[in-house]
């Protein structure tokens, strides 16, 4: 077997580095360099590939439910749902390398929720994994969240970053333009010079996709700058998932990046091997045979 030879000025023989006139990878990179500050994806199982608890749950109406690892769907008597790990076989998310998604279908509608009722999907972070954001310092970094989403509804949804350590919140919105079509969304959130994330293994941050809720969650104003958390601000742009049994919502390819990126500059999703993804999930849940 012949092995490639290494040249300190050219790298692998026959390949010219960028510094010597080679061609840089352009999508999400600058001068051929990945702009990420993190070596691994900050969001674990963002491609929805690992589902230790099962791949389909029916008659879901309350409590914490995990159709895939690290993503928790939590309704409180606001509609009834089927939640699944969906296998993808076509569409733009599939064309971009995603083979699984988390899908929520409304099976019993509730178009008039009680004031305290809600339904959201969330994923959580330890503070020690968030220190690159330098939150609470004068050098605080912006946040960029990206994901693929599909629904029968053409409407606007709200996603929140919820700082548990300091009880602070900031919100962003995404618009679904075409029904039943995978669309990629990129949302920027501002830096926060107030309130550092604790540097430990306790819960510090929640990324929260609010999908429905009563007036206690819709009565405020969605904050575009970090502020003290108020429940009334968390679902101002109500997606109304429970409003009809025709409604569904699916998501995959969720990534959180340090810094501000656009749809053209955001680094590619970090596809891990299934084993690497699975072992990171085991830190939080182990389904013993």
Predicted features, each with a name:
Residues 1-13:
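Short, intrinsically disordered N-terminal pre-domain segments
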Residues 28-289:
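Extracellular and organelle-lumenal recognition/adhesion modules and their flexible linkers in secreted
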């Amino acid at each position: 077997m012949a092995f490639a030879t290494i040249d300190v000025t050219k790298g692998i023989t026959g390949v010219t580095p960028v510094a010597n006139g080679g061609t840089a990878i352009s999508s999400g990179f600058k001068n051929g360099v990945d702009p990420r500050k993190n070596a691994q994806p900050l969001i674990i199982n963002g491609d929805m590939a690992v589902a230790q608890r099962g791949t389909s749950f029916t008659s879901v109406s309350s409590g914490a439910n995990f159709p895939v690892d690290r993503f928790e769907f939590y309704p409180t008597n606001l509609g009834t749902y089927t939640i699944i790990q969906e296998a993808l076989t076509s569409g733009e998310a599939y064309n971009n390398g995603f083979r699984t998604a988390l899908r929520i279908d409304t099976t019993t509608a509730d178009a008039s929720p009680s004031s305290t009722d809600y339904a959201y999907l969330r994923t959580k972070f330890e503070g020690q994994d968030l220190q690159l954001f330098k939150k609470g310092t004068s050098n605080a970094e912006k946040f960029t969240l990206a994901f693929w989403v599909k629904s029968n509804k053409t409407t606007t949804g709200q996603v929140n970053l919820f700082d548990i350590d300091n009880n602070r919140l900031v919100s962003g919105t995404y618009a679904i333009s075409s029904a039943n079509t995978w669309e990629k969304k990129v949302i920027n959130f501002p830096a926060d010079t107030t309130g550092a994330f604790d540097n430990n293994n306790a819960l510090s941050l929640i990324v929260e996709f609010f999908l429905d809720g009563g007036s206690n969650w819709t009565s405020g104003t969605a904050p575009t700058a970090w502020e003290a958390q108020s429940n009334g601000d968390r679902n101002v742009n109500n997606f109304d998932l429970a409003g009809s049994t025709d409604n569904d919502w699916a998501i995959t390819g969720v990534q959180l990046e340090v810094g501000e990126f656009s749809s053209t500059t955001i680094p590619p999703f970090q596809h891990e091997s299934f084993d690497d993804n699975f072992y990171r999930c085991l830190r939080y849940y182990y389904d013993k045979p």
